[in-house]
Amino acid sequence: QIFIPLTVGGAINTLEDFDRVLKAGADKVSVNSGAIKDPGLIGAAAKKYGDQCVVLSMDVARVDGKYHLFTKGGREDTGLDALEWAVRGEAGGAGEIVLNSIDTDGVKRGFDLEMLEALSKRVSLPIIASGGAGKMEDFKTLFTLPGVDAGLAASIFHFGEVDIGNLKRYLTENGVPVRL
């Protein structure tokens, strides 16, 4: 028997949406656009289910030298300062943050370390980095950054560019503690 926490996101706009996915078996709920539309949703969900259940998902890109928060899968600039939004999310009850850098997503040249560092200086929540992994070394570099707790990648695994087992062994050999 193995425990793998399941986080579900997408079209989470109300407490009823939280109810629906949690009753279906999710352990955590990731919310982005719904929280932007209704910032009180984060606090209401944290109060009802606990902050460990609420994941603030952020799609962020640089606009005129500032970090802007995007919605609708990264297609619409909200004009909100992403770092300020993260601080509000933490104060509102989010338990962790997934930061997807639109600037590096799919580019496969490494995670957006500058953006992650800026975020980690503003919040004390666990941060999960997303967007940019292209090789095993990118994960090693990521995990040397203080304040980053996890890394998320998709395409490098889907297309067989990096094998998960090999990545875990590589990280272990390079002093990054992972479960083998």
Locate each region found by the language model.
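Alpha-helix-loop-beta-strand connector modules within alpha/beta enzyme cores
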Residues: 1-7, 43-59, 108-135, 175-176
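Short beta->alpha connector loops at strand-helix junctions that form conserved
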Residues: 10, 31-34, 154
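Non-catalytic interaction surface on structured domains
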Residues: 1-5, 16, 88-89, 95, ...
